[in-house]
């Protein structure tokens, strides 16, 4: 039993990247796919409620944070607005920055704005 506890402790200390690498190694070693296991496990509940994954997102500026000038520059670059319009948008947060974008684009825009110091939500 102590060996199992040690394994649990070791796994709990892994970073997300290390856990993902471990999953890949185990998939290769055992010849299985983690995605297939999730699909099989989810199958009984799927009949109860089929939930579609969201495909369109709205990038919402929650707040500008401490670096308002940097956030205004990023908003201008993303939206193509003029300086005054971008400043008004940032100061009027929470406001949508871009609507109807796919998940990858939304994540990219969120990362850009957060790097500039903004707090961003995806809806």
UniProtKB/Swiss-Prot annotation:
- Cite the entry's keywords alphabetically: Ribonucleoprotein, Ribosomal protein
The Gene Ontology CC terms held by the record are: cytosolic large ribosomal subunit
What InterPro entries does the record tag this protein with? Ribosomal_bL12 (IPR000206), Ribosomal_bL12_C (IPR013823), Ribosomal_bL12_C/ClpS-like (IPR014719), Ribosomal_bL12_oligo (IPR008932), Ribosomal_bL12_oligo_N_sf (IPR036235)
Q: Which GO terms describe its biological process?
A: translation
On subunit structure and binding partners, the annotation says: Homodimer. Part of the ribosomal stalk of the 50S ribosomal subunit. Forms a multimeric L10(L12)X complex, where L10 forms an elongated spine to which 2 to 4 L12 dimers bind in a sequential fashion. Binds GTP-bound translation factors.
Protein family according to the UniProt entry: Belongs to the bacterial ribosomal protein bL12 family.
The molecule here is called Large ribosomal subunit protein bL12
Provide the species name.
Rhodopseudomonas palustris (strain BisB5)
